Amino acid sequence: MAALDIGCTCPNRDGTLDTRGCIFCSAGGSGDFAASRQLSVTDQLNQAKELLSSKWTPEPGKPSLIAYFQAYTNTYGDLDRLLSCYEEALSSPEVAGISIATRPDCLSDIILEGLDRLQLLYPDRFIWIELGLQSIHDHTAARIRRGYPTSVFYDAAAKLHARRIPFIVHLILGLPGETRLDLLESIRAVNQVHPFGVKLQLLHILKGTDLALLYEAGKLPVLTQEEYLDLLTSCIAALSPDICLHRVTGDGPRKLLIAPQWSLSKRNVLNGLHALMKQRNLRQGDNYEPGTSYTL
């Protein structure tokens, strides 16, 4: 996966909704691993391929790279410019498809129509949308300064389903004030919406964020690795077996990460998850509660 920065901003940053952003979001707009926004999409992809070359060898003639439009809100801005960036990635012979990180309140009919056209132009490439939900609970949304009510997420999900555009939902484990029950309610709600995929992300405390101020003031407990794995196994067991699990952890940039430091060892986290799932004899979907799909 090649993380890209195409110079977008966010309504939570540019004054449309706020200027401070979500309380956990870094100055890089959650795109701290992306290449420089001063580079073209093609140059960023080439740089990513070079960085990945030590652990990834593309099969000749077979596209296998995901172009991940990650930094800030990648459907927010000039439509022609956005579509041009998407198309530049889709036209790369090494790119299998694109994944576009955005907010549910930034999916206008115009941008969706543009994505429809690209799906027709590039039928052999996939186009995914990644929605930053974080929590289904509006009280949590207010606490983290998300900037939109959960009803907007449901509307966006319905629009994407109607246009057959696959989407992935981001949820964060360890948000301020959230309980295990809150988190499992978010999982159940996502099951009902039934996206193509889900990313489960550990809450990182990064330098320069309002979350860091809460942590440094002693007002924010941070999950231990054991607590995180306990929550994570519960989430995976409750998640529909038909939903693709794209991420189960994350590693914040070393130069910015304040806590939890244990998250820097992704291998330890993954090994711990495998061991705990095996110990508890759990698989994805074992505790899934089928219900009426939101999209029906």
What are these language model-derived features?
Residues 1-43:
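Canonical Radical SAM [4Fe-4S] cluster-binding loop centered on the CxxxCxxC motif
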Residues 22, 88-95, 185-199, 269-284:
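Structural recognition of alpha->loop->beta junctions
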Residues 28-48, 52, 56-79, 94-107, ...:
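Core AdoMet radical
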Residues 40, 77, 81, 144-152, ...:
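Alpha-helix N-cap and loop-to-helix initiation/capping positions
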Residues 49, 53, 115-123, 157-162, ...:
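Surface-exposed amphipathic alpha-helices with a cationic face
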Residues 79-87, 108-119, 183:
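Distinct, well-ordered alpha-helical segments
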Residues 151-210, 226-249:
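Conserved C-terminal portion of the radical SAM core fold
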Residues 197, 205-296:
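Auxiliary Fe-S-binding modules of radical SAM enzymes
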